[in-house]
Amino acid sequence: MIIKIISVGKLKQTGFVNLVNDYLKRINYYLKCQEIVVNDEPEPTQISTKLLEQIKDKEANRILKNINQNDFVIALIIEGKIISSEMLAENLQNWLNASYPNICFVIGGSNGLHEKIYERANYHLSLSKMTFAHGLAKVMVCEQIYRALSILNNGKYHK
């Protein structure tokens, strides 16, 4: 069982990179975790709705290459379900007990996720109704996974 954190585009801010790496190390204490970064598409200055969909489609295809047929997929989308850290821990425990080969958290790029990712996802999760910088969202996902594992293992991180 592996937790995969799949995201579009490399983080450019050193602070975010350092925080993500720190949380990945902490997560790996409890459970194997793999960060997968797929390339984002260059975005032209003038973009039509059709071109935007083509960009998201190409990024989605790269994401889907890293997801196995029986993996449990959580898509991070603003329209997703907003839950507490305790509920994430409970859900994570249920997903672990269900013996999925992998649990995949998918974070889209600056244009969001393509519809085919929404359709493939088993669960739609929202961090908030607010919009966050891509790097900050990735840090928050990693932190919440670590917090959930800490809750499940009676760690001292969550009080």
From Swiss-Prot:
Main location: cytoplasm
Catalytic activity: pseudouridine(1915) in 23S rRNA + S-adenosyl-L-methionine = N(3)-methylpseudouridine(1915) in 23S rRNA + S-adenosyl-L-homocysteine + H(+)
GO cellular component terms, semicolon-separated: cytoplasm
Molecular functions per Gene Ontology: rRNA (pseudouridine-N3-)-methyltransferase activity
SUPFAM superfamilies according to UniProt: alpha/beta knot
Protein's cellular compartments: Cytoplasm
Binding positions for S-adenosyl-L-methionine per the UniProt entry: 76, 108, 127-132
Disulfide linkage: none
Keyword entries, A-Z: Cytoplasm, Methyltransferase, rRNA processing, S-adenosyl-L-methionine, Transferase
Domain of life of the native organism: Bacteria
Documented EC number(s): 2.1.1.177
Signal sequence bounds: none
Database matches in Pfam families: SPOUT_MTase
The UniProt record lists the keyword Acyltransferase: no
Subunit annotation: Homodimer.
Role description: Specifically methylates the pseudouridine at position 1915 (m3Psi1915) in 23S rRNA.
NCBIfam families registered for this protein in UniProt: PRK00103.1-3
PANTHER family: METHYLTRANSFERASE, RIBOSOMAL RNA LARGE SUBUNIT METHYLTRANSFERASE H
Protein name: Ribosomal RNA large subunit methyltransferase H
Organism: Ureaplasma urealyticum serovar 10 (strain ATCC 33699 / Western)
